[in-house]
């Protein structure tokens, strides 16, 4: 069962020269092109989304809450609803962008109309740093933590760890940076080649990089691992990587 979306507008947000490139925000302009943007910018994204549902089903406990923190348009929420079969589970999707939550709700209504026996879902427009988490068997954060201020990441992960039920898991996907300068340069260049192959111009690539450089701050895998262990998780395993994009599972 595929993800349900509208036909996305083509991402042309950075196609024209901008005298001053503003910081990237998840506003209505981004929402209109987001499915196209993410597909053309993040290698392996469909595989990650689909398998968060598959892997999440292994950790979901009956009659528990499953969180999609930073849910954007609800791709992970839809995947969890398709794959999790545990009795009494429900998904809570959280995002601080009103435009994202509004469009996400439309996509979920469309999914409900197309498929039967999906998990119930609730959408919350909120800052995940201020959210009081219910006891949960699964938390997914798909390219969300990298937009949280670095000095607030550990506190957020501690809150998630406290809310996790025994046998639960956190699935965390992030863009990575690399401590080795040559490895970082190689994978950065290969990612740029991926974007070129998907139709982005040099101008679009450069301007989007400028828009993101102050708001998206990636960590190395080792930094993620050390922070997750400091937050109280017992084990961290990377299950996917494509170029400089990866996903990991952290167990309580």
Swiss-Prot record:
SUPFAM superfamilies: S-adenosyl-L-methionine-dependent methyltransferases. Its EC number is 2.1.3.-. It is an enzyme of class 2 (transferase). GO terms for molecular function: carboxyl- or carbamoyltransferase activity; S-adenosyl-L-methionine binding. The keyword Chaperone does not apply. It catalyses: prephenate + S-adenosyl-L-methionine = carboxy-S-adenosyl-L-methionine + 3-phenylpyruvate + H2O. Gene3D superfamilies: Vaccinia Virus protein VP39 (3.40.50.150). One of its GO terms (biological process) is tRNA wobble uridine modification. Keywords: S-adenosyl-L-methionine, Transferase. S-adenosyl-L-methionine binds at residues 45, 70-72, 95-96, 127-128, 142, 209. Homodimer. Belongs to the class I-like SAM-binding methyltransferase superfamily. Cx-SAM synthase family. HAMAP family: Cx_SAM_synthase. Catalyzes the conversion of S-adenosyl-L-methionine (SAM) to carboxy-S-adenosyl-L-methionine (Cx-SAM). This is Carboxy-S-adenosyl-L-methionine synthase.
């Amino acid at each position: 069962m595929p993800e349900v979306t509208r036909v996305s507008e083509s991402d042309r947000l950075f196609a024209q020269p901008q005298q001053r490139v503003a910081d990237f925000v998840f506003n209505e302009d981004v929402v209109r092109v987001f499915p196209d943007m993410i597909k053309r910018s993040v290698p392996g994204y469909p595989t990650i989304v689909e398998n968060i549902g598959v892997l999440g089903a292994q950790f979901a406990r009956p009659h528990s809450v499953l969180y999609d923190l930073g849910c954007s348009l609800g791709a992970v929420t839809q995947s969890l609803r398709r794959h999790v079969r545990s009795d009494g589970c429900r998904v809570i999707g959280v995002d601080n962008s009103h435009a994202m939550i509004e469009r996400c709700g439309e996509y979920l209504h469309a999914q409900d109309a197309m498929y039967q026996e999906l998990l119930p879902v609730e959408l919350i427009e909120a800052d995940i740093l201020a959210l009081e988490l219910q006891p949960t068997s699964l938390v997914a954060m798909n390219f969300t933590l990298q937009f949280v201020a670095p000095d607030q990441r550990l506190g957020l992960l501690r809150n998630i760890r406290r809310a996790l039920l025994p046998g639960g898991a956190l699935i965390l996907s992030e863009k990575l940076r690399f401590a080795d300068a040559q490895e970082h340069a190689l994978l950065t260049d290969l990612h740029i080649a991926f974007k070129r192959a998907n139709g982005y111009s040099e101008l679009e690539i450069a301007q989007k990089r400028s828009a993101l450089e102050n708001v998206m701050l990636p960590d190395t895998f080792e930094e993620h691992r050390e922070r997750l262990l400091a937050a109280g998780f017992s084990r961290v395993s990377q299950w996917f990587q494509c170029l400089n994009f990866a996903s990991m599972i952290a167990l309580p």
